Amino acid sequence: MARFGQPQARCRRCAVPSPAGVAECGRCLGAAPPVDACHAAVSYEYPWTALIAQYKFNGQAGWARNFATLMRSAPWVEPALEQADLVLPMPLSRQRLAERGFNQALLLARALAPQKTDAGLLLRVRHTTAQTALDRKERLGNVKGAFALDPLRAALVRGKRIVLVDDVMTSGASMFGAAQAVRQAGAAVITAIVLARTDEQ
């Protein structure tokens, strides 16, 4: 599967496609996101849109390992995983987990770094409307206050290098909301790793 993922120049902070040689996009230069780096394996376009939909919504949980191999093929992902102290999957609300039957981000995280993945440290404390039908401003408001760390174990991230894992990143609202919660708990370095990134922020 990795051979079908073509390398793409991307903003180092949000992974949106950018011209070769441009380290950061204009949006990130104007307002730096709460992640230090963001890496994406592929653009969220056909055939990846269809494959990811099958993975998430049609019970193809077994595809996680192949997708993780694809993610590892992206530049800088291997070093980020090697240097990480903890790998945290983006959490689902209880309602979404019940609908889907599994957390696709958790399966990816475990396939990427089984010894470093902590499934219960980052929590989604509020169920949110599905982001797909919302514009950027609405998405940012939708996830505000939706993420928190387990208060009994939040100190585990203090001064540590944290990797956040998700399958798809669109506006970045969910990823950055989660990263903000991790940053507020004292994480030293936060890197986001996603399977697919949309071409627009």
Predicted regions span which residues?
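Glycine-rich phosphate/pyrophosphate-handling loop used in enzymes and phosphotransfer proteins
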Residues: 1-201
